[in-house]
């Protein structure tokens, strides 16, 4: 039989779709590079986590002895994984007529779908950060709000640099203020990295990014946080599986199925603050 449609005829196409999709998914995700990421399990079982508290250092007399202190974890929360997926349908006619274009379009479609899903889920967690809240619904964020949010987190003894991720219009209002705008710096290593397209500036240990996946409105919620404030638990990395549908379109089509399995949630809520303000 001539002109069979077999996997051998599409293997290169699928590989290219995967490469383009993975690149699009990676480049389109703003929040993920700044959160705690787990990748040590392929199980679909929930991950239960906790935190330790208590314990003090005290003087010990020369004739004294140390006393044991409680060392138990308090329940913190649960990360429950779920499968997320998207599909591109490539007919035989489309593949034969313009395979390079079909490859690119399918890859971008699947990658963008994955990136938007993950990023929207992570950005939606900003409203669950508990170190403090700055700004008001209907108001515009100010630099005083920014530094107050930083102070809220520092008060929790959270060390390291913080990421501040805002809706693009929230950032616009900050930088268009007529007074009180600090002299912002550029971190070259961030600007030239894969996340550089979303990077705006740095100041005082804070790196600023914009993310259009933050829900827009008069009370848009941005976040300032340390890495361990939010967790992303990947059980199955981004993958693509093709499936042949012989009856579709008369002479068949390839279903290019993309999927991931992951969990996400607030990990250390006190290690982040809410920045509320209009994005309209």
What are these regions (language model features)?
Residues 1-30, 201, 226-280:
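Protruding loop/beta-arch "assembly-hinge" segments enriched in small, turn-prone residues
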Residues 128-202:
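Extended, solvent-exposed, turn-rich assembly/linker loops in the middle of proteins
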Residues 74-97:
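Short acidic, glycine/tyrosine-flanked loop/strand segments centered on an H-E-D-like triad
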Residues 91-160, 274-280:
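Alpha-helical scaffold segments that mediate packing/assembly in large oligomeric complexes
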């Amino acid at each position: 039989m001539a002109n069979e449609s077999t996997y051998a005829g599409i293997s290169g196409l699928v590989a290219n779709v995967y490469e383009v999709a993975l690149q699009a998914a990676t480049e389109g995700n703003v929040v993920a590079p700044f959160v705690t990421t787990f990748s040590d399990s392929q199980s679909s079982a929930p991950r239960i986590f906790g935190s330790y508290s208590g314990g003090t250092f005290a003087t010990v007399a020369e004739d004294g002895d140390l006393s044991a202190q409680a060392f138990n974890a308090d329940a913190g929360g649960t990360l429950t994984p779920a499968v997320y997926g998207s599909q591109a349908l490539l007919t035989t006619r489309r593949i034969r007529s313009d395979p390079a274009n079909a490859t690119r379009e399918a890859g971008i479609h699947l990658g963008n779908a994955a990136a938007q899903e993950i990023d929207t889920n992570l950005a939606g967690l900003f409203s669950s950060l508990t170190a403090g809240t700055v700004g008001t619904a209907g108001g515009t964020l100010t630099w005083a709000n920014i530094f107050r949010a930083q102070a809220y987190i520092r008060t929790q003894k959270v060390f390291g640099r913080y990421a501040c991720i805002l809706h693009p219009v929230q950032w616009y209002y900050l930088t268009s203020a007529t007074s009180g705008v600090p002299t912002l710096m550029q971190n070259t290593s961030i600007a030239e990295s894969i996340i550089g397209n979303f990077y705006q500036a740095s100041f005082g240990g804070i790196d600023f990014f914009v993310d259009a996946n933050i829900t827009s409105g008069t009370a848009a919620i941005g976040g300032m946080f340390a890495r361990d404030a939010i967790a992303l638990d990947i059980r199955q990395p981004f993958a693509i599986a093709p499936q042949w549908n012989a009856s579709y379109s008369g002479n068949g089509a390839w279903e290019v199925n993309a999927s991931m399995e992951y969990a996400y949630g607030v990990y250390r809520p006190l290690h982040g603050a809410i920045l509320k303000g209009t994005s309209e």
